[in-house]
Amino acid sequence: MIFHYYFYTDWDVQELLKNAIALSDKNFSELNNFYFSRYPNNIFLTVFFSKIFTLFNGLLGQDFAYVFLLVIQSILNILSGVLILKVTLLLTKSEKYAFFSYWLYLLILWISPWVVIPYSDSMGLIFPILMYYIYTHPKMHYILKSVLLSAIGIIGYSVKPQIAIMIIAIIMVSLLTQKIEMKPLTATIIAIFVVSFPMFFAINRINSTAGFDLDYEWEMTYHHFIKMGLNSETDGGYLANDVGSSISIENKEERVIYNKQIIAQRIKDYGVTGLINHQAKKTLNNYNDGTFGWGLEGSFFEKIFPNDSYVAKITRSFYYSSGKLHLIFQGIVQSIWLSILFLVLGNVLIGREKMTREFLVLMTSLIGIFLFESIFESRSRYLYTFVPIYIVAATVGFQQMTQNFKKRALKLKTGVKNEQK
């Protein structure tokens, strides 16, 4: 279906693709060193894209390579749905609830057009749910789990930094809830180090030898994104003036000092009440969009390819902002997303006896992504990679709501019978 409505977009995606093609063609003079000096976290994905372009350069051309990237993302999307099903079955021990979670996946992720945007959101979709699946796997040896989680966590972080929230949640819960035994702990640490160091070295090597001439004085540090997250003009969203003010300071140390001063000033100007109100608006921005910011980035529909087929007309009407059916698409995903968020609340009903490590990791990861969005720049798109985790949490919450309702109904029925006697 993606072949009928895919298009070229602008913003960061275009920057990655242009530079991936330049790397593939070894046209190093065309590389945007300034962009990647500012955002070095995008280098790994750009290098990966370049390898795909290199693979198809002499065969079917760049257009086919682009479509192949979308096929990869489609496969990752489908695999994410399978993992949602498996994890939910393990947690709820119910096929009924497992299939319920899969229906949620179909209605918000499988249907999602983000699969045609080759970027870290769709490429990173599988990582949190894959790590959680490995962690919850009942028969996998703990050393193998540690090795796989380390490897996948490092790759995931290189694709999209907030993916690391899942591995942080796993580490935190493990340290706080598990009894520490020196022998298995030592074996685990050794296994992690044996995997992690070579992988870190390999990824750094890939990034540093790709062909970019980076000036790390231009790097946008986390202080910039905290500053932007505190702006009142866009309620913590992207603000061109904030980007411009950071770029205007060439010295990295001076830029960090400047951003810290702006952070302190904005917090002072808000005050306690103002900061709470700002956070409320920011949370609404983050969580009140079931499309996850579809169509809002840059010149989104930059180049649309002619296609007069019936399927193309329907899908484009459904997914393109100007389409007659676009409001239906928005209505479907918005209602499903708000339902997911509501069902997540059912987890507060879970008793202590059901608070397993798996459950605690699930909740901790959601708290982690909430804090990430609360502290840094606000975008609903940044939630996309964690939607599979939200679906799992929503299904577990729905099961708990149902069980509590049945218990109360039974008590009420029993009480009425006793009164009649």
Model-flagged regions — what are they?
Residues 113-123:
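Short acidic/glycine- and proline-prone juxtamembrane loop motifs at membrane-interface regions
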Residues 5-21, 25-60, 255-256, 272:
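Extracytoplasmic catalytic/substrate-binding loops of multi-pass membrane glycan-assembly enzymes
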Residues 145-160, 171, 195:
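Membrane-interface alpha helices of multi-pass inner-membrane proteins
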Residues 84-107, 357-360:
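Transmembrane-helix signature of polytopic, membrane-embedded enzymes
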Residues 208-309:
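Membrane-proximal stem/loop segments at transmembrane-domain junctions that anchor or position
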Residues 66-68, 285-366:
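Membrane-interface anchor segments at the N-terminal boundary of transmembrane helices
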Residues 71-92, 130, 342-346:
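Transmembrane-helix motifs of polytopic, lipid-linked glycan transferases
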Residues 39, 43, 58-79, 327-335:
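Loop-to-helix entry region of an early transmembrane alpha helix in multi-pass inner-membrane enzymes
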